[in-house]
Amino acid sequence: MINLFISMPMRGKTHKEIINTRYRAIARVKLKFPHEDITVINPLPFTSGERPLPVFCLADSLKRMTTADVIFFAKDWEIARGCRVEQFVACHYMPQILRMYESKQNHRKKEPFKCLTL
């Protein structure tokens, strides 16, 4: 079984766009691991109207990310602060975890993203 964490920008996205991004991520990971079951590590659920501080959401994401076997960085992850922090942590503190990327830039260059530095 593969535990999948999806790092994706969510600001300004509709519920449908978020769900479609998740499906694309799952499909890409399934292509790489066709004989494995995939469990998506879901973010902390919030009740309608609840607006926690962004740093609270980021801390929760980092905690949940530690249980992942694969971290998938969705399109435009490079422009979202939280995604950049997740990528930094994944590279520098969790190097054993497989990182996969969905980005136009990555597909054109045909090379993996380098780990971000401070």
Protein language model regions, located:
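Conserved catalytic or regulatory cores that recognize and/or transform ribose-phosphate-containing ligands
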Residues: M1-L118
